[in-house]
A protein has these predicted regions:
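Short glycine-rich, Thr/Ser-proximal phosphate-binding strand/loop in the N-terminal lobe
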Residues: 1-9
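Phosphate/pyrophosphate-binding loops at sites that engage ATP/ADP/AMP, CoA/4′-phosphopantetheine
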Residues: 20-33, 132-135, 251-263
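Short glycine-rich phosphate-binding loop at a beta-alpha junction
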Residues: 30-40, 89, 259-270
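Glycine-rich phosphate-binding loop of actin/hexokinase-like ATP-binding domains
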Residues: 103-193
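A mobile "lid/hinge" subdomain adjacent to the ATP/sugar-phosphate binding pocket shared
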Residues: 193-241
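Residue-level detector of conserved catalytic or cofactor/ligand-binding positions
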Residues: 269-277
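Phosphate/ATP-binding catalytic cores across multiple sugar-kinase/actin-like superfamilies
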Residues: 125-128, 241-261
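Short beta-strand-loop/turn "lid" adjacent to the catalytic site in phosphate-handling enzymes
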Residues: 22-69, 95-106
Length: 278
């Protein structure tokens, strides 16, 4: 999203690319019955399929509940749907909230734990697994770990994601670019010293894109890091194993949420996994 200042500008940049892609692959817009977009950050809602309406579009355009590229999903779906006279939807946006009351507690009432995670991917892989084993999704206890640019690990209890780390705001394992959980007093000191920027937006951008593996190794490219690990680079090896260590800890924590009654642990990985890490 570099180089554009608003969601409308970003949508205007991406929309012709999407339409050209569909045309290139022989898909006529008139052949679609509906348009579905990924995301975005709306107010907390249960999992499901939602029609895009004016209120949702206003929240997405104004980034009322957070700024993320996934806000474009509903915006673009609505614009394309309006052009062809078809309905627009979003499915399992990343803010679906099925967490228990106790899971929302953080340590202070002013800072409740929020449910922000890779909901669409987690729900999809969990339901696919349920279909593969011939059981209803709502009859299983599953732990699903999405590992990509962000990492979220969810406890799926009988069809509801009752606890999950917030992959957007610094909760859980560090990732390719994000820091995960950090010591709050050290972060406060860095903020007051303006170590990573003079204002909120500069510091937010730092914590969203300059931490994790980037901070430890100088790159977010898993292929490069994997090659360095294979060549015996001690810095890359320690950082990579550290990320795996933290993800494994998060999986273990979610098993406690499910009372140790776990039918399966599902790993959805979009990052390169080197042989030594396995």
């Amino acid at each position: 999203m570099e180089g554009v200042s608003t969601m409308e500008e970003n949508a205007a940049m991406r929309k012709p690319l999407i339409l050209d892609f569909l045309t290139h692959h022989g898909h006529s817009l008139e052949s679609f019955d509906a348009v579905v977009g990924r995301g975005g950050l709306v107010h907390p809602i249960p999992g499901g399929t939602y029609a895009v309406n004016d209120e949702m579009l206003r929240d997405l355009r104004e980034c009322r509940f957070g700024t993320h590229v996934c806000n474009l999903g509903g915006i673009l779906a609505a614009e394309i749907g309006e052009e062809i006279g078809k309905p627009a939807f979003i499915v399992d946006p990343p803010v679906i909230d099925e967490m228990t009351d106790i899971a929302h507690l953080s340590g202070h009432p002013d800072f409740p734990r929020r449910s922000v995670f890779h909901a669409l991917n987690q729900k999809a892989i969990a339901k696919r697994y349920a279909e593969d084993v011939g059981k209803p999704y709502d009859a299983l206890n599953l732990i699903v770990a999405h590992m990509g640019g962000g990492v979220t690990v969810g406890a799926h209890e009988k069809g509801k994601i009752v606890d999950v780390n917030n992959g957007l705001e610094g909760d859980g394992p560090y990732t390719a670019e994000r820091p995960g959980s950090l010591p709050v007093l050290q972060v406060l000191r860095a903020a007051f010293e303006h170590r990573y920027g003079d204002n909120y937006e500069d510091q937010r951008r730092f914590y969203m894109s300059k931490c994790g593996m980037v901070a430890y190794t100088g790159t977010n490219d898993g292929r490069v890091i994997g090659q360095r690990v294979a060549e015996g680079d001690p810095e890359a090896t320690l950082a990579y194993r550290g990320m795996a260590y933290q993800i494994a800890k998060e999986i273990g924590a979610q098993s406690v949420v499910l009372g140790g009654k776990v039918d399966a642990i599902l790993l959805l990985s979009l990052i390169h996994i080197s042989e030594p890490t396995r």
